[in-house]
Structures are given as structure tokens and as C-alpha cells.
Amino acid sequence: MQLLLTIVVCLFAGAGAGLGTGFAGMSAAAVITPMLVTFLHIEPYTAVGIALASDVLASAVSAYTYGRNRNLDIRNGLIMMITVLAFTVVGSLVSSLVPSVAMGNFSVLMTLLLGIKFIVRPVMTTKEDMQQIPKRTRIIKSIVCGAIVGFICGFIGAGGGMMMLLLLTGVMGYELKTAVGTSVFIMTFTALTGSVSHFAIGGAP
């Protein structure tokens, strides 16, 4: 019975994560982590590591698809990615020292903020509007946003994709499809770094 429950939960978690990543640039950890914790009673820290590992392939496939349709900003994405990777390790280290309840509450708060943002201020930016932003401004914002996203991705996993989308559209002025494409491109590498550092610090499940 337990094996059947595990298979069913994993199938639903995988399906939800795939749809969320491909359609909205959401981290797979936003779906997988709470399902593993709630139904399979896996420790939150371990669940985040598993979810981030699942995120690697899902994000890579989504990024390839968005890239083929020219909805991917690789230049600024690479700058942001390097900063994100550095702070992902820091976030993973801090999360191992923080109580599980705090991690869960932070994840819920980030999801709530993202939902409110898109309801109050929908993304109406076009690709033409994006081109008007000075190159230097983009680089500075990429570094700052990368540091924030990297820490959050390593800390709770679920916040990585959602926060990245929030910052790309709200702070950096990205058009929505390009924001999603760039987000999943960066998440491919943050998820890989996050999962490896999680298991290196906390041990493999």
C-alpha cells in the first residue's frame, strides 16, 4: 500500500511540476516539495534536494523550447546565472541551520507575493520596451537580482523560479515569455547546484 501511495504521489508531483515549469517558469520544487512532505512525510530539507534534482531536466527541456522560439535572453541570463550559482550554495548552507517551519512559511510568503503582483500589476511589457533599457542598467540589475534569487533558491528551492519570474518582470522589465524562458534557463543550473549542495551538506536521501 505504501509503495502504491509513493508511486501515485510521485506521478502527480511530476505532472504538476512539468506543467508549472513549462507553462509558467515555476520551479518544480514548488509542487514536489510540499507533496513529498505532506503525503510521504519526507524531511523538508531532503524533499527540497529531491525537488531541485528533478528541476534540472524539466528546466533544461523548457529552456530549449523557449530558446527555439527566441524567447530567451542568454547574455543577461548568463550574468545572472553566475551570481545565482554562487548564492545558491550560501542559501543551501543557511537552510540546513534553519528550522523546517521557517522554511515552509517563507515558501508560502513568496508564492503569495508573486500571485498578488500578477493580479495587481499584470505584465504588459513588449520586446520593444525591453530593448530601450540601457545595457549597463541590465547588467547591474542582473547581478543584484541574481544574488537574491540564488540565496532563495538554495534556501527553500521553491522560491527560485517564482522569485526569478517576479524580479525579471517587475524589476528588470522583461516581456513575460522572455522572462519565463530566461527563468527556466537559469533554473537548469541553479537547480543542479542547489541539489548537489543540499545532498553534500545534508547527505543523500
PLM region spans:
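Transmembrane helix boundary and interhelical junction motifs in multipass membrane proteins
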Residues: 23-32, 156-167
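Short hydrophobic/aromatic, small-residue-rich stretches within specific transmembrane helices
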Residues: 51-55, 183-187
